Regions:
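Serine-hydrolase catalytic machinery in alpha/beta-hydrolase-like enzymes
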Residues: 1-4, 17-96, 207-224
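Conserved alpha/beta-hydrolase "acid-adjacent" motif
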Residues: 170-179
């Protein structure tokens, strides 16, 4: 059994109750520049943040100092699906916090964390791992991997979803997200996508926005 932890940060002068919060789900290599970037921005807007660490509590996700030895097995073993489960856990935990407004809990995720933020809205996954009666108020996946099709992945909750991707992202194909959004819109869902021109993966960070190797195909290794 894994124990996953997170850090709850309240903005300056936050109220004693009914504070909105955004759950932050990190990418493959853990909490880094992109996640810290959004933590600061969200807190500056008067919104609390809950930074989930999905790596350190998992046997195959414990990273060494140079991020090369074990971290790759985290993605290989879980393919980001653990972010979905962690997102549900964070939602349940925060909904019972005395200072948090349970109806204003949002989610933002980067890369593999964005997969969690995107697909935790799938009703089938919610039935498997979520808590009945609890949904996120909003979902913001940043450059998510949409290049895997799941059974009934067009049957989602009514949570508004806003996807952000770079036009030149070769790490995860942009077209797959555009097509997924079109499929969800055809179902009448509140989903939209923003494609930023001349930008790559992790485009919002100082060290990101660079060209990655192109992934030609993808095998998730497991069935969900």
């Amino acid at each position: 059994r894994n124990i996953i932890w997170g850090t709850l940060n309240f903005p300056d002068n936050a109220a004693d109750k009914n504070v909105p919060v955004v759950v932050i789900l990190h990418g493959m290599s853990g909490v880094h520049e992109a996640e810290e970037h959004w933590l600061k921005i969200i807190n500056s807007m008067g919104i609390a943040t809950f930074m989930v660490d999905s790596n350190w509590g998992r046997k195959k996700c414990k990273k060494d100092s140079n991020l090369k030895k074990d971290i790759k097995w985290c993605a290989a073993a879980n393919r980001g699906m653990n972010r979905i489960i962690d997102g549900y856990g964070a939602l349940e935990l925060l909904s019972n916090h005395p200072r948090i407004d349970p109806k204003r809990i949002g989610c933002i995720g980067m890369s593999l964390g964005a997969r969690g933020c995107l697909y935790l809205n799938v009703k089938r996954f919610k039935k498997m791992w979520g808590t009945p009666g609890l949904d996120f108020a909003a979902s913001v996946p940043m450059y998510p991997p949409c290049n895997v099709t799941y059974k009934e992945d067009d049957e989602i909750t009514d949570t508004p979803i806003r996807i952000h991707v770079g036009e030149l992202d070769t790490y995860f194909p942009v077209d797959s997200c555009v097509n997924y959004v079109a499929k969800l819109k055809a179902k009448g869902k509140d989903v939209d996508i923003k494609v930023y021109p001349d930008t790559h993966h992790s485009f919002e960070t100082k060290t990101g926005g660079k060209k990655f190797m192109k992934i030609r195909d993808h095998n998730d290794g497991r069935c969900y």
